[in-house]
Curated annotation (Swiss-Prot):
The keyword Mitochondrion applies. Monomer. It comes from Vitis vinifera. GO terms for biological process: tRNA N1-guanine methylation. This is tRNA (guanine(37)-N(1))-methyltransferase 2. It is found in: Mitochondrion matrix; Nucleus; Cytoplasm. S-adenosyl-L-methionine binds at residues 212, 250-251, 278-279, 410. It is an enzyme of class 2 (transferase).
Length: 510
């Protein structure tokens, strides 16, 4: 379908007053309510015949050149002001004048719903308009895209349409470019943060901006945050800006690449550790106590140095055969001193995990060989601590297996299924302070109840949830809404001893 722009031309036959330029302000005040009132059209314009004069364009309601449609007292004021000269004035409102909504209503068939900026079209990305055109609108997708492009250029430089449903493991939709340049890299600004991303490679939804800030507002400076499905950092970056220490993970390597870029753009790279791995493995490795941190049992003698070396070497070999691997991009200079006592006599124990846990200088250099998921210590600079961090401990002393304050699970399509990762996750004798808050996002359909969702979460945890909080985030479809389920992780679920007993008890009930 081709767009004929000339069909939108509207000719207006109006009257105007020709008066000296210096009197326009006074005259327009006298004629208040009787001037042309059209959006984006100024009622005072140049006189093409004289540089010292101006035209004051009168309202469409003024039909007679004798100005009899204007009250007599106002006409008298004008006569006192200057000699009145009434001239005909022709105004054409063309395609460029009309809004996208007006144009689309004219070209789409009767009964076809016009896509609105709040339902189908997202303008919040810096230069990309994302359409979700389906069904009866598909034959008109190109003309719709052109109108959106024309009416928003140069703010919008690319118009895309989502193709099909999301089926890939990274939850990134496929797009076709309908009009504009083939450039999906953009920057988005939310509150005080800037996010760079490639819209074709990573997931982004600007409609969740308020939710990002709502959740982050619950965090306090110095708290430890674990983001299991971080994307490019919509939660991680503002949390780090607030002074939190963030462990951020995503399965999509492009998301982690942009997370690291965004951490540097927003100058919070000292507060974020970026992981690229499966979420279950991520949380499991994060909470695993490194060998050199394991406390000896009271009735077991302390290992001799040679025995310790042997065990550590075995652990290192296991790590190389599929354990957590590390991509370190430089760390604080004082971290390496923490490992001196171990390095003096043998290979570092559990090098791949301990390096992340202690963020030590013994991590392998960037661009090394890694067979599995990677972890990135984002931008640790020598002799520099984050000035924005208000926590009492330096980042090098943080041990997540001892304490985490909040865990974010923003994968609403399946996050609840990942709650089983918390079963017996934590060793009681190492944990300090209260257990973390879990913030698990999910979808609830019209035929589902809050109780059903909570029950599903309890089944995944194999433990009861005390005082759950369900926050409605937004409607995503007529019969489908996004929620955030928040609750304090229970001892029954996460401590190894309690979880094992709970599992045995539940098995005995079968």
């Amino acid at each position: 379908m081709l767009l004929d722009e000339s069909k939108f031309d509207l000719q207006l036959k109006l009257w105007a007053l020709r008066i000296p330029s210096q009197l326009c302000k006074v005259a327009s005040r006298i004629l208040n309510g009787y001037l042309l009132d059209k959006p984006r059209v100024k009622p005072i314009t140049e006189d093409p015949t004289c540089e010292t004069n101006r035209y004051i364009i009168l309202s469409e309601r003024i039909k007679n050149p004798d100005l009899s449609d204007i009250p007599e007292d106002k006409r008298d004021e004008l006569k006192v002001l200057c000699k009145i000269e009434v001239v005909p004035y022709s105004l054409t409102l063309g395609y460029s004048y009309w809004s996208a909504d007006h144009v689309l209503k004219q070209i789409l068939p009767d009964g076809v719903e016009v896509p609105s900026s709040f339902e189908t079209i997202t303008f919040s990305l810096c230069h990309i308009a994302h359409l979700n055109i389906t069904g009866e609108l598909l034959p008109y997708k190109d003309v719709i895209a052109k109108v959106i492009y024309d009416k928003n250029y140069p703010r919008i430089k690319t118009v895309v349409n989502k193709v099909g449903t999301i089926t890939n493991e990274f939850r990134v939709p496929k797009f076709e470019i309908l009009v504009g340049k083939d450039d999906m890299v953009t920057e988005v600004k939310q509150y005080r943060a800037t996010f760079k991303l490639d819209y074709s490679l990573v997931y982004w939804n600007s409609r969740l901006e308020h939710e990002h800030m709502r959740l982050v507002s619950q965090f306090r400076p110095g708290q430890i945050i674990c983001d299991m499905f971080s994307g490019v950092g919509p939660f991680a970056i503002p949390a780090a800006q607030k002074g939190c220490l963030v462990y951020a993970n995503d399965l999509n390597p492009d998301s982690i690449r942009y997370l690291k870029i965004n951490a540097k753009i927003n100058k919070v790279d000292d507060n974020i550790w970026a992981y690229n791995m499966d979420a279950r493995k991520f949380i499991s490795q994060l909470m695993e106590v490194p060998v050199h941190e394991i406390l000896p049992e009271p009735d077991v003698p302390v290992l001799k140095a040679t025995e310790e070396c042997s065990i550590q070497a075995n652990v290192q070999t296991e790590s190389q055969n599929g354990g957590l691997t590390v991509e370190a991009i430089g760390v604080h200079s004082d971290d390496s001193s923490n490992m001196d006592g171990i390095e003096g006599s043998c290979t570092v124990a559990d090098d791949t995990v301990a390096a992340v846990k202690k963020h030590s200088g013994s991590c392998e250099e960037e661009n090394g060989t890694y067979d599995n998921a990677t972890v990135s210590v984002v931008g640790r600079r020598k002799d520099r601590m984050n000035k924005r961090m208000r926590g009492s401990e330096s980042s090098s002393n943080i041990k997540p297996w001892e304490h985490v304050d909040h865990v974010i699970m923003n994968l609403p399509a399946s996050a609840i299924q990942f709650l089983d990762a918390f079963r017996g996750l934590i060793q009681r004798k190492y944990w300090k302070g209260s257990l973390p808050w879990i913030h698990c996002y999910c979808f609830i359909r019209a035929n589902e109840t809050n109780e059903m969702i909570i029950s599903e979460a309890e089944t995944a945890l194999n433990a009861s949830i005390q005082e759950p909080i369900l926050h409605r985030v937004r409607d995503v479809a007529p019969n489908k809404a996004m929620f955030c389920l928040s609750f304090r992780l229970s001892e029954e679920a996460c401590f190894k001893e309690d979880a094992t007993k709970s599992l045995l008890d539940s098995s005995g009930d079968l």
